[in-house]
Amino acid sequence: MLAFILSNLTGLVRQVLILKAFGTENALDAFNAASTYTDLLFSLIAGGALASAFVPTFTAFLAKEDRTSAWRLASALINLVLLILCLTSLLSGLFAPQLVKLVLAPKFTPPLQELTATLLRVLLIAPAVFGLSGLFMGILNAHQVFFWPALAPTMYWLGMILGVLFLAPSMGVYGLAWGAVLGAILHLLVQLPAFLALPARRYSRTLGLSSPPLRQVGRLMAPRLLGVAVVQINFVVNTILATGQPEGSLTALKSAWAVMTMPQVVIAQAIAIALSEQRRAAKRRRKRK
């Protein structure tokens, strides 16, 4: 719980510093439009839908003391997620101007669309890093390790804070974008020592496309993915609508959403993750008896 509170306080500080540095100028609107797309990529491919399907399947193998199968599944998902996110990010970077003009910000002026496309290419480094980090988070939670995954979002905000304070004065909004990339890397690195310390950890170079456990993850993921897609499409629609409004409208919308969801993350998400993993642990203990 404390780690979640720290994360949200750090996120609030980040939001204040960003608004202080950029106000509601067009450059920040461009950054927010670009980040909407990278958030969409991560959420659809490696976000909560995947975690909610992967963790129960992975935990079931742990309950049966079948760590070989558990890590084979984890390896397959790590490889598959990285492959999909890297290819998608590469293609998105190549067609960034078209994405911005036709999908993300059709009502921006041409110079602002160009800035958005450039920022998008920088931010596209982050989804693959977040994808790997998100899987680390699920694996650690399945092993009853909660502190480091809960601290990871704080490190992401910290990276953005460093970008605002030290890069933005000389690089402008590009400093904020590179700060976001740094934050994604810190999000991964803070979990890495705990991940490497897990027992019987074994990585294999396989995609496992025909394996029953991976197919089970896909089946569990499908209905959740539909819900995530609806939410993310709503964000994209809001972004498109905001780009046709006065300068700063998109920034105001994003800031308001961040403040509104803060209590949910601090209280509901922290309790839900802890209770979910405790329930799975209790189930494993009953099976052993």
Predicted regions span which residues?
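Membrane-embedded alpha-helical bundles of multi-pass transporters/translocases
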Residues: 1-289
